[in-house]
Amino acid sequence: MVAGCAPTKTESPDSGQNQDASANNNDVSALNWRVPDFTYTNQEGKPFGLKDLQGKFWLADFIFTRCPNVCPPMTANMAKVQQELKKAGVQVELVSFSVDPEYDKPEVLKAYAEKHGADFSNWHLLTGYSLEEITKVTKDTFKAQIAHQKGTSPDVPLLVTHPTQFYLIDGTGKVVRFYNGLQPDAAQIAKDVASLNKGK
């Protein structure tokens, strides 16, 4: 069985209003959005947390494996971004948080990512937390919402509203940029990382 999902929005850094994932003004560095300390479980069944990302830029998104619409292209796009950043010599870790953690066990996440061409050398798919916890982190840190609803048919038993952005976080855990996860620009991400590195 599969589940339906729908995109949610992230607050605009300039107006305080919600904007969709294709918005051009994606610099949120002045807003001091910070990722709280965490230790979850990765696709290998091993602990992985914020301490493993200290001093590194990382790109985060929110997905679930039963999603039939936005998550497959997001995951494929993340794989493409991963390849392009490596070609450009830009070091960025990738982190995908499941918004369906009860179902998305480590082996489920690993098989899903493999199907979409993931390289696990710097891509970490996380689970091992409650829905309540990831919902709170998404709301408090990324100013977006996760909402589970009953599905519309036996084939779609679950509907999940979740963000479709890719979020760039710096080595201190501060969210500095976001991008449209359905149409990401790897060249722009690489340019932003290079610029932010120079500004350290």
Model-derived regions, located:
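Thiol/disulfide oxidoreductase modules built on the thioredoxin-like
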Residues: 130-192
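Bacterial signal peptide processing site
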Residues: 6-9
